[in-house]
Amino acid sequence: MPLRVVGAGRANEGLRADWQEQLATVQREIGFQYIRMHGILNDDMGVYTEDSHGNPQYNFQYVDALYDALLKLHIRPFVELTFMPSKLASGPQTVFWWKGNITPPKDPAKWSALIRAFTAHLKERYGEDEITHWYFEVWNEPDLHNLFFTGNVDDYLALYKNTAEAIKTECPACRMGGPASAVPWKFEEAFEQYIVANNVPAAFVSSHAYGVTKGFLDAAGNAGTVLDPSPDSISGRMKHSRELIQHSGRPNMELHFTEWSSSYTPTDYLHDQYHEASFILDKIKRAVPYVDSMSYWTFTDIFEENGPRFTPFHGGFGLMNLEGIRKPSYFAYRFLGQLGTEDIASDDSQSWITRSSDGSIQALLWDYTPIVPPAPETDQSFYKKEQPATVKGTLQLRLDHLRDGNYQVTIYTIGYGKNDAYTAYLHMGAPSQITRAQLENLNAVSKGEPESTERYQVNHGKFSRDLPLRTNDVYLVVLTPSEVFDATPKKASR
């Protein structure tokens, strides 16, 4: 589940070569199943216009170029159906630098025809069996009135019904849902009541969650935010959303959190810091019982809601920065991608122990110590600065019931100064533009290579290791049977 879905900014950005190159790296080293982004129907995707007589004209060339590239990288679209093509819009209101229109359609019949044509085209190009594995989400955060949607809850529900029925007409087995809400829980409850009362198709409920206690979402990304230190931030929101579904008339619907992160602004330097890695692991581990997926917002800092960014690190959402430098958050997901398929019980909540079919054991361990900026500071000022870790003592790893024999023990780390490109960037003087040599140096300190490797003889089924622990350190300890390790082709470092 943790590697099911990841986010990206907007569809048109996905046509860029550097965006696709970064996603190729993500897929090679992590491997998500789905990707969600804004704006597949935006004017910059050229999907819809009208002739001089008001007759609809459809064009899916940019959509094809994007979706072809995604499928080639073995990642499927989690289709967010936004925003309103200007020729269909009922008003001029837009959001972001790239001007996504946030109004309902002026002609619901023309909107329905567009959705039918879009779905029929996808079915023809990719096959009905393929697109039944996709998800179709209607709109984005319609509960943020006049930010993402100018209508009210009734307007959204009417839009949802129109859209879902149009998709079902062309693809009866396709999966659609909503409301992609930002605020708990008004729209979720209204959505669930409406689809039951009106027999409207829906396969899933979607919502968003961010781990802050202060601030608000503004299109310019200037609001100050403060980390929520509660253990139940993120997961508590998801738990209640699951309970709402269970008590609805459709208790078997899936629950997808199609955006989540530590903060909802692309100017929060916690996103760049090493603390984000342990935050991600802790929140995912707590949320797993409640959700079918949670889509980290986003995989890349190639993200233009506020327009092109002027520095290589600026608190952007991405797992990778503009130049493709891997952040500590990237390695949290990479470590998750190295876990095995069978969970093993652990008595420590800040751990994830697994086994692979070849007998390898993976122990993912972390210290999550939330550090709240002292008032009146916010994440924007506090986490912009270097944040040395504090020594906490020794982490004791003890594994029992292993098969006796020789193992290759490989240890990977994330933390202050370890796979920590942002701290290295600060030590360079935080240049507003980086040279090729500086880029090479930053990539060199964030390659994810093992901290140590050694052979270990397991006797009586036991393995033990003491590891030095600082605040927000992360360890991945992999025990691979020597015969498996020796037979595995070794990859060259990139």
Sequence positions of predicted segments:
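Conserved, mostly hydrophobic/aromatic
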Residues: V5, L70, F118, F136, ...
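Substrate-binding cleft and catalytic face of glycoside hydrolase catalytic domains
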Residues: I30-P229, H240, P251, T265
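Mature N-terminal, pre-catalytic/accessory segment of carbohydrate-active enzymes
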Residues: M1-Q33, T471, E483-R494
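Carbohydrate-binding surface patches
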Residues: D347-A430, S464-D466, T471-V478
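Short, acidic/polar
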Residues: E13-Q27, K186-I195, A277-K283
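Short, solvent-exposed loop/turn elements at domain surfaces
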Residues: M1, N12-A17, M45-G46, G215, ...
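Aromatic/acidic polysaccharide-binding cleft in carbohydrate-active enzymes
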Residues: F257-Y383, G415
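C-terminal beta-strand-rich structural cap/linker in extracellular carbohydrate-active enzymes
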Residues: Q433-R494
